[in-house]
């Protein structure tokens, strides 16, 4: 049924096995790795961690950047630094990678799952507005859940597949109800809305540099913020809360060993030097996909919206029904083309089935019809 589509995808990558999103190392990775090894500083202290943080500040225009060993760790610390704990709740979207909900759960807080927007695949502003108007009340400059009577202190949105959420509308709703906005921009490095980097609209944002991201160090994450006090606390919590001293080991609270290692930072710093090239390449691939699937009779390409510039981390198709999606998925896999369905909705997972959620109309309508296409940067690694 999808012979033409499979042939087209094969022509784009010209490989026997086509990955969903493989790493691309074409710059100074080996050079910086050797420098890192020769320095003797390969763990959580070293020149490349600082250089990477400074370069990421320049790319995102965030005042402060704290590098961590994963995006999940970054989100966990961001929540803790904003005072999220077992005594409160956090709004988030129904479809996201499980790490979004896990990080909330690590703090002891309960996630409240709201529906996604059918165009952005991120949190629906309409669902958020309906929930805030009908299921919360205000007291002492806090929003409380009418069902549990617990304060809702934060809203975590995820910019799905590098596409921007309706970030301005969501931010306005959060500010109106005294709810902190935290952006899970794990998939959105290089994406912007109105020329402002995703991850820099809320109180803080996070990025991920896992092996399948647009740049990678094998692992890695980062917290972005313009709030100096929050940034200081986040850095403190991510480095075991060690009190600075020439030789004593003293720690003022329970904290975490989440600091990015210098050896990973060396690879990331090299990748960041090529970010603009990668973004240009990925946007070119997205246009090719968009043109091919335009007016397709079985699916449509999920495109960026006005005022948005996406990194198109994972190009995405929405099929007319689940059966068509499954046929496409199976035919691609038989031809060694790795495509994937979207994650199962978070409220459907065993760990979160007892958490509150609203009527997830779009979630139920979309989750079994979406497919991510191969989206690697199509630049050959340099030959030695």
Predicted segments with their positions:
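N-terminal "arm"/small-domain region of PLP-dependent enzymes with the aminotransferase-like
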Residues: 1-42, 374
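PLP-dependent aminotransferase class I/II
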Residues: 8, 50-54, 62-63, 126, ...
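Phosphate-binding glycine-rich loop
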Residues: 42-89, 103-106, 113-115, 137-147, ...
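Conserved PLP-anchoring active-site segment centered on the Schiff-base-forming lysine
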Residues: 78-132, 145, 156, 331
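Helix C-cap/helix->beta junction micro-motif
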Residues: 107, 176-177, 296, 335
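Active-site phosphate-binding strand-loop segment of PLP-dependent enzymes
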Residues: 119-217, 223-224, 229
């Amino acid at each position: 049924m999808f012979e033409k589509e499979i042939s087209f995808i094969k022509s784009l990558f010209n490989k026997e096995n086509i990955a969903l999103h493989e790493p691309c190392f074409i710059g100074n990775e080996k050079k910086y790795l050797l420098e890192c090894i020769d320095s003797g500083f390969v763990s959580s202290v070293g020149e490349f961690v600082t250089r990477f943080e400074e370069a990421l500040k320049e790319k995102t225009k965030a005042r402060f950047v704290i590098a961590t060993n994963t995006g999940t760790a970054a989100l966990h610390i961001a929540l803790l630094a904003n005072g999220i704990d077992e005594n409160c709740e956090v709004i988030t979207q129904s479809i996201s990678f499980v790490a979004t909900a896990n990080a909330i759960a690590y703090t002891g807080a309960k996630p409240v799952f709201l529906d996604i927007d059918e165009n952005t695949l991120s949190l629906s502003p309409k669902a958020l507005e309906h929930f805030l108007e009908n299921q919360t009340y205000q007291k002492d400059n806090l929003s409380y859940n009418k069902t549990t009577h617990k304060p809702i202190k934060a809203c975590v949105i995820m910019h799905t597949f590098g596409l921007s959420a309706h970030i301005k509308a969501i931010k306005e709703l959060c500010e109106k109800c005294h709810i902190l906005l935290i952006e899970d921009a794990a998939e959105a490095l290089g994406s912007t809305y109105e020329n402002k980097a995703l991850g820099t609209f809320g109180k803080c944002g996070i990025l991920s540099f896992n092996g399948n991201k647009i740049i990678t160090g094998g692992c890695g994450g980062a917290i972005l913020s313009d709030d100096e006090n929050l940034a200081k606390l986040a850095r403190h919590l991510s480095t075991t809360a060690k009190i600075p001293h020439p030789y004593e080991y003293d720690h003022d609270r329970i904290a975490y060993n989440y600091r990015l290692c210098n050896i990973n930072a060396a690879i990331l710093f090299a990748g960041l030097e090529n970010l603009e090239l990668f973004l240009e390449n990925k946007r070119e691939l997205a246009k090719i996909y968009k043109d091919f699937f335009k007016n397709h009779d079985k699916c449509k390409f999920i495109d960026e919206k006005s005022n948005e510039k996406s990194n198109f981390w994972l190009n995405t198709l929405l099929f007319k029904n689940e059966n068509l999606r499954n046929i496409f998925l199976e035919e691609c896999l038989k031809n060694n083309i790795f495509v994937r369905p979207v994650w199962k909705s978070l409220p459907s997972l065993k760990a979160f089935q007892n958490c509150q959620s609203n009527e997830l109309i779009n979630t139920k309508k979309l989750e079994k019809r979406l497919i991510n296409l191969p989206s690697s940067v199509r630049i050959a690694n340099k030959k030695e």
